[in-house]
Design a protein with these regions (language model features):
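Primarily recognizes the serine-hydrolase "nucleophile elbow" in alpha/beta-hydrolase
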Residues: 109-174, 331, 340-394, 402
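Cap/lid segment of the alpha/beta-hydrolase catalytic domain
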Residues: 79-94, 282-284, 307-320
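N-terminal cap/lid segment of alpha/beta-hydrolase-fold proteins
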Residues: 20-41, 228-271
């Protein structure tokens, strides 16, 4: 069960604060969230989880300084959040999922021209919470996480959901929830351990950090800790480390496709005569999308990832989608010298795929060897709305009439046997082959099996 931490943006109260306006967003879960908005374009979105009342003036300076650097900053009282979670009536707390949804809602509310996977900065109590949400969310859901004065424990009665890779243990002596190290490389994490030993055993913290995968970890040390001065040199050294790297999954595109949010995943070993275009789910290029692409690349298939969250951040039409696909297919067919392409889609990406295929140019459609729809629903949306996470919007288009028009090329529909919203079994078997796999909409996390199913259907040539 999710914690249901959603924005209640019924009103916005603005108060003047030095060089930037601080907007107070009333919320039933977060109390009053403070939003520092830059005067110009937003380059990054940062959630700042810190206790109110602790170095308040310094935390305010931190928010203002980040806003001057074109960062939209959302300040949340981590102490109040933690207190509310103590009384939560739920099986477990899923901060990763909740903050992902909240970020979508917030950025849509402010009508940012493109979606920015958020960064998180946690101080004190917020440091442990930011580590937890990083581990719970699929890789690249967030741009990066910074935990300042980090201790690997949190006072919480309700268990934390495992999510993607969060492991915990209950401390027998104190009753606190002990956070355990990640088991594999994950979203970028910058950490400044609590070396003072005032909040936790500094040796335990150092041991925790030493057991983490080094590929996504940077340890920042300073004689002056962030607990002493949250807006001082130590904090900004760490924040600089966090923001100095590109957002995971982002890749400079060629000039002809610079307007499309694409990610190239190059093949390993002997390549095939076919490349794949994979339209992601509405959460963006993460989770299943990344893992399936990696599995295909390991088998010699070059993949062009197409980030649905960023692409549909503004309203699109089926014709516009197909026109962009024509450009993409023509470009990569020539650049990679591959005559065939597989068109793949997951969740929202699968929902729009029949509309795309039916509107392709004759030349592009002639190159398509396989259409694979994974986690197909009943309605397709061509613009992101936060309400889409709950159900289809009023502008949704019915999918079944489009799938009824599919003929050549070969089409398959992959679904989880436990997914109640799948429409695969409603499709005409003469046009689309339905293939069932164990699990629900996320296939029990066995994304390698999804990739293998696609490869078996494709019968690729090398």
């Amino acid at each position: 069960m999710k914690t249901g931490l959603r924005l209640a943006l019924s009103s916005i109260l603005c108060v003047a604060a030095h060089a930037h306006a601080v907007e107070i967003l009333p919320d039933e879960n977060y109390h009053d969230m403070q939003v520092y908005r830059p005067t110009g374009d937003v380059k990054e979105v940062v959630y700042l989880l810190a206790d109110h009342g602790t170095q308040e003036a310094a935390i305010t300076r931190l928010g203002e300084r980040l806003a001057r650097e074109s960062t939209l900053v959302v300040r949340i009282d981590s102490a109040k959040l933690l207190a509310d979670l103590q009384n939560l009536k739920a099986n477990c707390v899923d901060l990763g999922s909740d903050f992902e949804g909240q970020s979508h809602y917030l950025q849509a509310r402010y009508q940012l021209p493109t979606y920015h996977p958020p960064y998180f900065v946690g101080i004190g109590n917020g440091a442990a919470l930011t580590y937890a949400l990083l581990a719970q969310a699929p890789t690249s859901t967030f741009a990066g996480v910074l935990s300042l004065d980090f201790c690997p424990e949190v006072q919480l009665r309700t268990p934390l959901c495992r999510g993607d890779d969060l492991r915990t243990a209950k401390h027998a002596a104190t009753g606190t929830t002990e956070l355990l190290p990640l088991t594999r490389s994950h979203t970028r994490w910058v950490v400044q351990p609590d070396e003072s030993g005032l909040r936790c055993d500094a040796r335990a913290t150092r041991s925790f950090v030493s057991r983490l995968p080094a590929s996504n970890l940077i340890t920042v040390r300073s004689a002056r800790t962030t607990a002493t001065d949250p807006a001082g040199p130590a904090a900004f050294e760490a924040i600089g480390q966090l923001l100095s790297h590109p957002v995971p999954g982002s890749k400079p595109a060629t000039s002809s496709l610079a307007d499309l949010p694409l990610i190239e995943v190059l093949p390993q070993g002997v390549g095939t005569d076919t490349f794949a275009v994979l339209l992601s789910g509405d959460g963006g290029w993460t989770g299943l999308d990344k893992d399936v692409a990696a599995a295909l690349a390991a088998r010699g298939v070059a993949v062009v990832g197409w980030d649905s969250l960023r692409y549909f951040w503004k309203a699109r039409t089926p014709d516009e989608l197909a026109s962009d696909a024509n450009r993409l297919i023509a470009h990569y067919s020539q650049q990679w010298q591959k005559p065939h392409v597989m068109l793949l889609g997951y969740s929202q990406g699968a929902n729009v795929l029949p509309f795309l295929v039916n509107r392709l140019s004759g030349d592009a459609r002639g190159k398509v060897s396989l259409v694979a729809m994974t986690g197909l629903g009943l309605q397709a949306d061509f613009e992101f709305h936060f309400a889409n996470w709950v159900g289809a919007s009023a502008k949704s288009l019915a999918i079944l009439p489009e799938t009824a028009r599919l003929g050549s090329p070969k089409a398959i529909c992959i679904y989880g046997r436990e997914d109640p919203e799948s429409s695969c079994m409603q499709l005409d078997p003469k046009r689309v082959q339905a293939i069932a796999l164990p699990g629900g909409h996320h296939f029990n996390g066995d994304y390698g099996k999804v990739a293998e199913t696609i490869l078996q259907a494709a019968a690729l040539r090398r």
